């Protein structure tokens, strides 16, 4: 009986290791530039489902945030409200041009690349040609670094080298 009990305990322990996820497993996710938009006459950020090579309407707000997301942590929109009137209200409309609000949020220190400093947010009204796309608006304000596929890797030199890397989820972002 003692031998049967010992075998049962060992078998249970082995099965538990196989079928129960270890508590020490690390959650992973991606650190990247997230792209958000707010259509004219709205102030709600919506995650862009296409890249910045789309036409944008006069009165829209374009938002970029250096963010983290994974299975356990959703990405977050820029921390500045997408309020066109607040961003561009003092900028007069010009014939043949459009006004676009631009927000660039460099994210949080908790997921900043090692050795790099999070920059100050950029909130600016951009007056641009009617045919300008999101990437044109962004490029009027700061230097854009892209990879060969067009993925935005760096804005204003941040981050300096990486491009959409997988990292361990910062503990401060995980639900407790």
Where is each model-derived feature located?
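Bacterial N-terminal signal peptides
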Residues: 9-17
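Ubiquitin-like/PB1-type beta-grasp interaction modules and other compact soluble beta-rich domains
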Residues: 3-4, 17-176
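Bacterial N-terminal signal peptides that target proteins for export
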Residues: 1-9
């Amino acid at each position: 009986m003692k031998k049967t009990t010992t075998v049962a305990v060992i078998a249970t322990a082995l099965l538990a290791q196989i079928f129960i996820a270890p508590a020490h497993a690390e959650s992973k996710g991606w650190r990247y530039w997230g792209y958000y938009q707010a259509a004219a006459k709205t102030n709600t950020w919506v995650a862009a489902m296409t890249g910045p090579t789309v036409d944008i309407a006069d009165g829209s707000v374009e938002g970029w945030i250096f963010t983290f997301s994974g299975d356990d942590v959703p990405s977050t929109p820029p921390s500045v409200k997408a309020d066109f009137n607040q961003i561009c209200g003092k900028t007069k409309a010009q014939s043949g041009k459009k006004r676009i609000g631009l927000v660039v949020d460099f994210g949080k220190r908790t997921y900043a690349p090692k050795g790099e400093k999070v920059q100050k947010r950029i909130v600016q009204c951009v007056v641009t040609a009617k045919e300008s796309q999101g990437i044109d608006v962004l490029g009027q304000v700061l230097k854009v670094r892209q990879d060969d596929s067009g993925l935005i890797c760096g804005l204003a030199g941040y981050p300096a080298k990486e491009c959409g890397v997988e990292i361990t989820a910062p503990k401060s972002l995980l639900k407790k």
